Regions:
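Bacterial N-terminal signal peptides
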Residues: 4-15
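N-terminal (or domain-start) structured segment
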Residues: 17-116, 155, 176-204, 208, ...
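An extracytoplasmic/periplasmic, membrane-proximal ligand-sensing/linker region
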Residues: 31-33, 176-177, 217, 264-325
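Residue-level signal for nonpolar/aromatic packing positions in well-ordered secondary structure
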Residues: 34-36, 43, 50, 67, ...
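Hinge/capping helix and adjacent helix->loop/strand transition within the periplasmic-binding protein
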Residues: 84-90, 97, 105-192, 241, ...
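A ligand-binding cleft/hinge motif common to bilobed small-molecule-binding domains
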Residues: 98-109, 168, 173-177, 204-237, ...
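Short beta-strand->loop
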Residues: 113-123, 181-185, 203-204, 213-250, ...
Length: 325
């Protein structure tokens, strides 16, 4: 576990924020440090964006924000911790909505309800994954990769950030649509998977942009495509996987959530302040440096999108054949 402490605060996720607090309490919020749980190892996209948001809140509100890394069990450990915390605005969750949605489809029994136990605070980003390969792999396009995988069934290994995570789902969806078989090697987070790709331990990783972009520029990793349905403005030269495999579309969403029953007034303050940060022209460049695009949304709009994503990703997880190790 690693914690980063900033002079400010952040929030987590819930379909209904039923409880309310006196107006003066909401206006004085926060009056003590806030803990922002990140269910991923340090060094990844979620960790980076959480620290940017935490730093902003601390500066604006004059309270510490502790960014608390709690990886494990495909984000379930961190999610459970937040779900069972009081809905008072002092325990928040920086979550990968796609992983949240995937878990809802993969696990028959979770220690929390992905909808009922969280309330939306603010969207943070949307970004493609990058279909990345080791330079030694003789494939320079998605079509060539599909042909190579068909010629070597079960012999080409891909790395992921863990079974049931978005990197795993992206690869398994690719396998199903392409009609190929590849070996899955799960790691404890995205950074170790990229390290394995650099070392040649695996041949393929569907990676976050920030984790592979420097290595793509240096030639140590070859990028073949983006996982979104359209080209990304961040990587305009890369075609979508869907150009070769119609229907392929995997988007990495990030969001701030809070425990259920967090008062609407507090959710509103958090949403307004985080959206104010993301509305700055300078923030667009910061997000782009992390390979992400800013997404601004109100809590009610977020809740609708969140439920749609859970339904979509649950279906993808089932159809792709992702299996828990």
């Amino acid at each position: 576990m690693r914690c980063w402490i900033f002079a400010v605060a952040i929030v987590p996720f819930a379909a209904t924020a039923a409880d309310t607090v006196p107006q003066n309490s909401a206006q004085s919020y926060p009056v003590k440090p806030i803990r922002l749980i990140v269910p991923f190892p340090p060094g990844g996209l979620s960790d980076a964006l959480a620290r940017v948001i935490g730093q902003h809140l601390a500066q604006e509100w004059g309270q510490q924000v502790v960014v608390d890394s709690r990886p494990g069990a495909s984000t379930i450990l961190g999610a459970e911790l937040v779900a069972k915390s009081p809905g008072d605005g002092y325990t928040l969750f920086f979550q990968d909505i796609t992983t949240h949605g995937i878990n809802a489809g993969l696990y028959r029994k979770l220690p929390y309800d992905s909808i009922a136990d969280f309330t939306p605070v603010a969207m943070a980003s949307a970004s493609p994954l990058i279909l990345s390969v080791h330079p030694s792999l003789p494939a320079k396009s998605v079509r060539e990769l599909v042909g190579l995988a068909k010629a070597r069934p079960g012999q080409i290994a891909y790395g992921s950030s863990g079974t049931g995570a978005i990197l795993n789902l992206a690869a398994e969806t690719f396998k199903k649509l392409a009609g190929v078989d590849m070996l899955h090697v799960p790691y404890k987070g995205s950074p170790p998977a990229v390290t394995a790709l650099l070392a040649g331990e695996v041949a393929i990783v569907f990676a976050t942009t920030a984790s592979v972009l420097p290595h793509i520029k240096s030639g140590r990793i070859r990028a073949l495509a983006v996982t979104t349905a359209r080209r990304s403005p961040l990587l305009a030269d890369l075609p979508p996987v869907g150009d070769t495999l119609p229907g392929y579309d995997v988007v990495l969403y990030q969001a701030v959530l809070a425990p259920a029953k967090t008062p609407r007034e507090i959710i509103g303050r958090l949403n307004a302040e985080i959206n104010r940060l993301m509305g700055r022209a300078s923030s667009k460049d910061i997000w782009a440096n992390f390979g992400a695009e800013i997404v601004i949304a109100a809590p009610d709009e977020m809740n609708t999108r969140f439920q749609q994503e859970i339904a979509k990703l649950s279906r993808l997880a089932t159809e792709s054949g992702v299996k828990l190790d």
